[in-house]
From Swiss-Prot:
Top-level lineage group: Bacteria
UniProt membrane topology term: Multi-pass membrane protein
Source species of the chain: Nitrosococcus oceani (strain ATCC 19707 / BCRC 17464 / JCM 30415 / NCIMB 11848 / C-107)
EC number(s) from the headed UniProt entry: 2.5.1.141
Protein name: Protoheme IX farnesyltransferase
Catalytic activity: heme b + (2E,6E)-farnesyl diphosphate + H2O = Fe(II)-heme o + diphosphate
UniProt KW Membrane keyword: yes
Pathway(s) served: Porphyrin-containing compound metabolism; heme O biosynthesis; heme O from protoheme: step 1/1
Record has tRNA-binding as a keyword: no
Phylogenetic lineage: Bacteria, Pseudomonadati, Pseudomonadota, Gammaproteobacteria, Chromatiales
Record-level GO BP terms: heme O biosynthetic process
Amino acid sequence: MTTITLIRGALTNWREYLVLCKPRIVSLIVFTAIVGMFLSVPDLAPWRVFLFGTLGIGLGAASAAAINHLIDEKADAVMNRTQGRPLPTGKLSREQALAFAITLGLSSMIILYFLVNPLTAWLTLASMIGYGIIYTAFLKPATPQNIVLGGASGAMPPVLGWAAVTGELHVHAFLLFLIIFVWTPPHFWALALARREEYSRTKYPMLPVTHGVDFTKQQIVLYTFLLFAVSLLPFVSHMSGLLYLVGAIGLGGRFVYLTIVLYRNTSNELAMKTFGYSIVYLAALFAFLLVDHYLPKFL
């Protein structure tokens, strides 16, 4: 496939290519990376690093998402939630999706390596491989703990953002990593619980299918309590202040409450409500981190 053909296809089917990028997920990824950038310095992150770092990390995340679509095509075709995606419907071919994923990935590496720094480029590449290939192709079909074992790649964005600005790794960046890492299982298992009948038709051994509803709910509650504790670490380590602490307690308390309600009253509606709140929770928690970091400077 020539470059001209790819460009023409992208212009014609741009909505389908956008779906391949999983824009909602990538938006959250990019936001947490941006928070990592700004928390890494006392003042504002340099505009050049902010611009190209955000672009490069976003393109890398979109590339991994497109690879995920490629590998998940057969499973997507039998699930109501994903049957309308570009590959199962034939709106895009596998060749188009692969060329798109490669183009995004190469663009990400070039931007990050030459316009940001090599460390961020290599870490982003590792994250792309971790999510797009290791998790999707190997862990996801192999074990019910796939989301736990593969969660590291999805938790990397704040580390990438931090490295983009400072050119180094820092323990505070890994506190942000740990929050997302522990957040991922209850977030995903709430969705899997609501869609357990659909997942039972795929090759993937999702926890509600292999271990049952009650065990899955128990794990969701346990991980959410663990997340509540982990979310306090930025305050305990003096990385963040009282404003963040109040936000973390309020947001975490609501998350714990929803999971307990779900544990006592199983329903797909409650599972989806918990899943939806988990997204709001993570975005709001990182917003509190950002506001807490800068608000004292304006008071």
